[in-house]
C-alpha cells in the first residue's frame, strides 16, 4: 500500500505541475500579473519538468544504478550503508529482527540435521547479505577453533539483542541449542511482523499528509497571484 500511495502521489504532483500550473501561467502572462517568489519557483519547477523531464529521469536512473552497483560489488560501501541503516531508529529493529529470524531458523535446521557448527556458520555467512552478521559468523568460527564458546561472538555485540544472546547461552549450556534457536526464530519473527505492521500504519497517514501539504502549497502558489490580478482589474 505505501508503494501505491507513493506512485499515486508522484503522479498527482506531476499532473498538477504539467497540466494545471501552465494554464495559470498563461493567464498571468496575458494579464501582466506580478508574480511572487513562491509562484516563480513553482513555475520554474513546472517548466523544468515539461522541458527537461528526461534529464531528471536520467539522473534518477543513473543514481539508482550506480548505488545498486556499488552496493552489490563493493563490500566497504555495502557495509557502510548497512551500518548507517542499522543505526536509524525503527529501521534498525526491522533489519535486526529479520536477520535474527533467518539466522536462528536456519541454524536450528542445520543443527537438527547434525551439521557441524563451523560448517553451519559458514553456510549462514553465505546466506546473509549483511556484512555485520557475516563478521559475527566468521568470528564464531574462529572462536570455536580456539576452543571458545559459540556465544562469545554474540556477547555485548550491538547487533545482537540481550534476549537473543541469553537464549543462545541457555541453549548452549543445556545442550538444547537447536530447540532454543527455534524459540529465537519464533520470537523475532513475531517481533519483526509487529514492527513492520506498525511502521506501515505510521507511514500511510504520513504520506497522505505530506501529499496534501505539497499539493496545497502548489495550489496556493498558483492562486495567490490571482488576487493581485483582480485588484488590477478593479
Question: Where do the protein language model's features map onto the residues?
Answer:
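Non-catalytic, surface-exposed connector residues within folded enzymatic/regulatory domains
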Residues: 18, 39, 75-78, 134
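Bilayer-spanning, highly hydrophobic alpha-helical transmembrane segments
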Residues: 1-69, 190-234
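Membrane-cytosol interface motif
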Residues: 33-43, 81-98
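Juxtamembrane helix-loop transition segments at the membrane interface in multi-pass membrane proteins
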Residues: 29-33, 66-87
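Alpha-helical membrane-embedding segments
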Residues: 55-75, 110-126
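Conserved protein kinase catalytic domain
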Residues: 25-28, 39-42, 46, 82-85, ...
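Glycine- and small-hydrophobic-enriched helix-loop-helix hairpins
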Residues: 92-202
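Conserved functional loop/turn residues at catalytic and ligand-binding sites
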Residues: 89, 114, 225
Amino acid at each position: 500500500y505505501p508503494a501505491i500511495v507513493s506512485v499515486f502521489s508522484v503522479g498527482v504532483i506531476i499532473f498538477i505541475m504539467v497540466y494545471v500550473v501552465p494554464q495559470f501561467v498563461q493567464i498571468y502572462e496575458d494579464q501582466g500579473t506580478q508574480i511572487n517568489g513562491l509562484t516563480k519557483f513553482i513555475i520554474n519547477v513546472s517548466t523544468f519538468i515539461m522541458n527537461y523531464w528526461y534529464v531528471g529521469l536520467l539522473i534518477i536512473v543513473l543514481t539508482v544504478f550506480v548505488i545498486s552497483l556499488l552496493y552489490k560489488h563493493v563490500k566497504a560501501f555495502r557495509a557502510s550503508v548497512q551500518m548507517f541503516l542499522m543505526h536509524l531508529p525503527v529501521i534498525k529493529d526491522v533489519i535486526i529482527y529479520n536477520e535474527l529470524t533467518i539466522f536462528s531458523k536456519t541454524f536450528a535446521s542445520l543443527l537438527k540435521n547434525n551439521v557441524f557448527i563451523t560448517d553451519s556458520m559458514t553456510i549462514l555467512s553465505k546466506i546473509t547479505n549483511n556484512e555485520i552478521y557475516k563478521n559475527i559468523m566468521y568470528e564464531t568460527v574462529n572462536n570455536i577453533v580456539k576452543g571458545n564458546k559459540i556465544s562469545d561472538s554474540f556477547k555485548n555485540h550491538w547487533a545482537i539483542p540481550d534476549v537473543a544472546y541469553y537464549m543462545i547461552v541457555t541453549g548452549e549450556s543445556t545442550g538444547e541449542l537447536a530447540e532454543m534457536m527455534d524459540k529465537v526464530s519464533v520470537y523475532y519473527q513475531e517481533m519483526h511482523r509487529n514492527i513492520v505492521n506498525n511502521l506501515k500504519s505510521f507511514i500511510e497517514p504520513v504520506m497522505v499528509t505530506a501529499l496534501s501539504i505539497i499539493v496545497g502549497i502548489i495550489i496556493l502558489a498558483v492562486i495567490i497571484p490571482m488576487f493581485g490580478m483582480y485588484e488590477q482589474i478593479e
